[in-house]
Amino acid sequence: MKTPLVTREGYEKLKQELNYLWREERPEVTKKVTWAASLGDRSENADYQYNKKRLREIDRRVRYLTKCMENLKIVDYSPQQEGKVFFGAWVEIENDDGVTHRFRIVGYDEIFGRKDYISIDSPMARALLKKEVGDLAVVNTPAGEASWYVNAIEYVKP
């Protein structure tokens, strides 16, 4: 289940992607398809086939973003969150072996292309919610339970 939450920055990036696809990339690819179609036989026309496929991919992504953005709830920073892990927090954790990780808890649609972002729906994020610095979070993993201590919590303030 995807929780329909997004940070303000994440929403703006999705909006930028939608605008880029719709106003810049789609018209450019449409011109290429039209040009390639004007050459005649489409069955062996690689330009036509490739750009037609790309146009379908763009349209699919535009439909997804449009539908997705209608349902997303933007979660802004609130001073009441300070000191505890909630949506949008940067969290630093450490295990008993001294291994540390730092990541931000964000919405599902924000995690792609970012190794330092995790989804609010992930087991790690669920285990960390409402924890404070010094608290122990136990995460169920395929290899068993893993224990992590919360070292730091930060929020991006507007």
Curated annotation (Swiss-Prot):
GO molecular function, a single term: RNA polymerase binding
Q: Name one Pfam family in it.
A: GreA_GreB_N
Classification via Gene3D superfamilies: Transcription elongation factor, GreA/GreB, C-terminal domain, Transcription elongation factor, GreA/GreB, N-terminal domain
Q: Does the entry feature the keyword DNA-binding, yes or no?
A: yes
Task: For this UniProt record, give its keywords in alphabetical order, as a comma-separated list.
Answer: DNA-binding, Transcription, Transcription regulation
| A single GO BP | DNA-templated transcription elongation
| Superkingdom in the source lineage | Bacteria
Q: Which family does it belong to?
A: Belongs to the GreA/GreB family. GreB subfamily.
Function in brief: Necessary for efficient RNA polymerase transcription elongation past template-encoded arresting sites. The arresting sites in DNA have the property of trapping a certain fraction of elongating RNA polymerases that pass through, resulting in locked ternary complexes. Cleavage of the nascent transcript by cleavage factors such as GreA or GreB allows the resumption of elongation from the new 3'terminus. GreB releases sequences of up to 9 nucleotides in length.
Q: What is this protein called?
A: Transcription elongation factor GreB
- Provide the species name: Escherichia coli O6:H1 (strain CFT073 / ATCC 700928 / UPEC)
